[in-house]
């Protein structure tokens, strides 16, 4: 609803029932303050780690998403004192809806680098293709969710069809995010299977091989998987929540929201911070960066390394004969 019908113009707890508020409950001050503080700390940690390890692309998605999470929980804290206010409700609704789509971009850029660590030859797609395709999907999801939120926000109370159109567009955006995350997980599993089946076709570069065998690397992969699954679960929940509309019982269940929205995103960002690629790539984050110009160079370097190994093996065979 637009602010022309804002219940805060005439409603207080003493005058209006909670069913006239934008959410049918009083948001928990302690719970929302906890998430606000947690995401603020994680944002600061991400900034420090980015400066230390120069992981600017990784920072972009996480910082953008975390800023939106912080704004969203500020809105929910404001709703604690007055759930009839439209402004804080809009802050919470839009920011917490689109924030995870931006967070997902940081996950997507990691897959291309993981492919370089293991070897491009066994991948179905080039490293840059993974990043470009999924970031593009993320952008589509983001635009749909933002557009749906904007349409819903300007609909007056008597413009049910317009409000429902906005909700449907938001659902489409969230559904596209679920679909892209599902495809991303499927391609990750496919690549993992190819790595498992082709251990002799992995990148022969010594530093890449050592990185693959390190405990920190394995922990990084586990953390990335955990973050992906957590955001996926959250997105499925939000699709189901919006499917019933803003006045459904699911959309007004605070415990479910704090668990399947707040906790899932918290788990994801904690994993993406504690197991930061700057800490787990052993100084190879920049070396695994692709670009249109360097993609071919990387392939030639791997070919040269492989040729060097073959030449050494041939010399060894000649020496033995």
From Swiss-Prot:
GO CC annotation: fungal-type vacuole; plasma membrane
Residue runs in coiled coils: none
Subcellular location: Cell membrane
InterPro entries given in the database record: RTA1
Membrane topology: Multi-pass membrane protein
Membrane spanning stretches: 31-51, 55-75, 92-112, 131-151, 169-189, 217-237, 255-275
Any one Pfam family match given in the protein's UniProt record, by short name: RTA1
The organism's place on the tree of life at top rank: Eukaryota
Residue positions with a glycan: 3
Alphabetical UniProt keywords: Cell membrane, Glycoprotein, Membrane, Transmembrane, Transmembrane helix, Transport
Stated family: Belongs to the lipid-translocating exporter (LTE) (TC 9.A.26.1) family.
Protein function: Efflux pump that is probably involved in the efflux of himeic acid A, a ubiquitin-activating enzyme (E1) inhibitor.
PANTHER family found in the cross-reference section: PROTEIN RTA1-RELATED, SPHINGOID LONG-CHAIN BASE TRANSPORTER RSB1
Full protein name: Efflux pump himE
Taxonomic source organism: Aspergillus japonicus
Name of the gene: himE
